[in-house]
Amino acid sequence: MQQDLFGSDSICPISSDDVLKATDPNFESWRERIVQDALKIVEQIPKWKHLGNHDGVALYEKAPAYTGHTWYGRVSKHTRSLKTFKKGLLYEHIKKEADYDPLVFSAHQLETIIEDEIEIWMYKYKTPWFFRNRVYRQLVVSVMLDPDSFIVLQTPVTYPGSSSGGGNGVVALYDSVDFVSKKLDGDGKEEGVLWICAVRNDYGSMFSGLFSDTTFTKSLVRQVKLYNEWLNRTYPRKG
């Protein structure tokens, strides 16, 4: 049976050999299962420990029962349309993130299973000068769930002989789920979107120990601000 992608208390990288090709007879069921695994995380976030609201962003936390990696969640409401959010988050997710977040760089695609839907990307994350940059190799799955919502999930992928980050980087691990749905007013007209995000990270080495709850939640709020500013610059409102 296929393992729940996010069910463990710890981040569990998947082997590149376990990323099915679109021609595999089990591909459709494999893709559906990992999307459902991600949706379970989205549904759980309101039940996590509430850390308060900051700049219009509701923050949540779920610590592992014993040892492992803590999940952090955020929920925010936005007045931009679902169509505009698709341009910013659904398509070329990693490439766009490198455009609006200055800490993400050297993003490039390693594999394409289905273009703009299931891809493997590699990117680097800038760290303080006294640490080596972090390197991520991520499976990125981007799916329209229905006309009114979409989901993007990431989980780390390992390749044979890829334990090293190469150059001056250290391999790190990252799970994330982004869920965006259309918000409607009382008359059924679109009034923006709801953006729900869950992340957990293992930066590796001593670097992870520097990230307290406060540091990480500030980072989550910062990303919303950076994204909104970039979206408004790149896709300005008409009129």
Swiss-Prot record:
UniProtKB keywords: Endoplasmic reticulum, Golgi apparatus
Annotated organism of origin: Schizosaccharomyces pombe (strain 972 / ATCC 24843)
Subcellular location: Endoplasmic reticulum; Golgi apparatus
Pfam family of the protein (one): DUF3074
Source taxonomy: Eukaryota, Fungi, Dikarya, Ascomycota, Taphrinomycotina
Record's signal peptide: none
Protein name: Uncharacterized protein C577.11
Domain of life: Eukaryota
GO cellular component assignments: endoplasmic reticulum; Golgi apparatus
InterPro entries associated with the record: DUF3074, START-like_dom_sf
